[in-house]
Structures are given as structure tokens and as C-alpha cells.
């Protein structure tokens, strides 16, 4: 599957290019068997925006691919398969091995 993006709110700006700094707000959940959101494992809401250089391996592959498909101001849901997430290792204490992940992401700033 890789990453599947569903737009919640259309953006009107450009899409980030590989290596550009992006500022985002996000919440992540484990996907349940029925494909819906399960347990929340992380959020930037209330903690401050998340800033990263996108497309260069600083985050999971699903984010590198999904966020570069977004436009500035866009809010989207990313469904990320295990091979584009944390894979067979998972993330100890938060994400079990081979978990499909769901992220709601807002692309707030590029550069």
C-alpha cells in the first residue's frame, strides 16, 4: 500500500520539494482491523509545531512521500502501511511491530 492520502481541507499553496523545511501539526493513531483510527500514539497538538526537512529520511518513509504530495495549507489523512512506517521493529512502548498507521497532518509552512 505505501501511503494513501485523503484530503480533509484543500491547500492553495505550493507543494514542498525534497529537502525543504516544513512545519506541520499532526496526530498519529494505530489503525484498527476495520481500517479506522485506534489508539492515539503521538500528537504535536498542544506541544508545538513539528519542523523537519522532508523527503530526506529524517522521518518515516510514509511522511516523506505523503507530505511532499500535500499543498501549503492542506489538511490530510495519511494511511501508512508498515513498510512505510516502523516495519517489523515497531517503536518500543508506542507502536507494535508491523502496524498500519493513520496520521492527520496539516502543512502549515514551507521553508
From Swiss-Prot:
Q: Which residues cross the membrane?
A: none
> What are the recorded GO MF terms, alphabetically?
peptidyl-prolyl cis-trans isomerase activity
Query: Where mainly found?
Result: cytoplasm
- Where does the UniProt annotation locate this protein? Cytoplasm
UniProt note on regulation of activity: Inhibited by both FK506 and rapamycin.
Query: EC no.?
Result: 5.2.1.8
InterPro entries recorded: FKBP-type_PPIase, PPIase_dom_sf, PPIase_FKBP_dom
Report which reactions are catalysed by this protein.
[protein]-peptidylproline (omega=180) = [protein]-peptidylproline (omega=0)
Q: What Pfam families does the entry give?
A: FKBP_C
From the UniProt entry, list the residue stretches annotated as the region Disordered: 1-20
Instruction: Extract one GO cellular component term from the record.
Output: cytoplasm
Q: Record's SUPFAM superfamilies?
A: FKBP-like (SSF54534)
Role this protein plays: PPIases accelerate the folding of proteins. It catalyzes the cis-trans isomerization of proline imidic peptide bonds in oligopeptides.
Entry's family note: Belongs to the FKBP-type PPIase family. FKBP1 subfamily.
Put simply, this protein is called FK506-binding protein 1
Encoding gene per record: FPR1
Amino acid at each position: 500500500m505505501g501511503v494513501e492520502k485523503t484530503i480533509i481541507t484543500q491547500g492553495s499553496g505550493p507543494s514542498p520539494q525534497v529537502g525543504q523545511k516544513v512545519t506541520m501539526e499532526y496526530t498519529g493513531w494505530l489503525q484498527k482491523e476495520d481500517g479506522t483510527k485506534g489508539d492515539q500514539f503521538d500528537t504535536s497538538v498542544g506541544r508545538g509545531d513539528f519542523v523537519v526537512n522532508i523527503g530526506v529520511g529524517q522521518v518515516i518513509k510514509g511522511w516523506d512521500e505523503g507530505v511532499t504530495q500535500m499543498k501549503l495549507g492542506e489538511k490530510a489523512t495519511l494511511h501508512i502501511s508498515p513498510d512505510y512506517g516502523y516495519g517489523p521493529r515497531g517503536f518500543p512502548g508506542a507502536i507494535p511491530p508491523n502496524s498500519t498507521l493513520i496520521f492527520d497532518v496539516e502543512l502549515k509552512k514551507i521553508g
